[in-house]
């Protein structure tokens, strides 16, 4: 827990250091402030911490009370929020438009949801030796997951659909302003995050 607290504070420290070093050219300081706001929102009660809190509270609910809507809220905030922020912050600092930020936020949501669903799949299909952590814990603890609500086949298809949507969105952004239309590094990164075996 302390490591997580330390890393979160280090993110703010790094952002503040960048803010302090920003040149006073027009637009740079407001972009730094906007980037720090995104970091605070996506890490805070309307992001990761809020999602983790909802996840902890959901563990106390009877399984039938954990709906698809609640699970989506948890995954969008606990998992996807920091992926969204990492994509949005770089774009803000580069001068992206609000419309581009919304698209990147959606891409981050797709990646985060696919990552979490894949994590739920691996908890069932992998082993301690491969994954490096105990498997089967969700089932043992009667934790509702995407797989337990929707089944394995649908979950695998949803991971693929979300990853394809994310890659399509990245390609669309890469085509703008004379871009090449593909960012192979990001496509491989997204695919590796989502198809990982551990």
Which residues does each PLM region occupy?
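Mg2+-dependent prenyl diphosphate-binding active-site environment of isoprenoid biosynthetic enzymes
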Residues: 1-171, 179-191
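C-terminal domain/tail detector
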Residues: 192-198
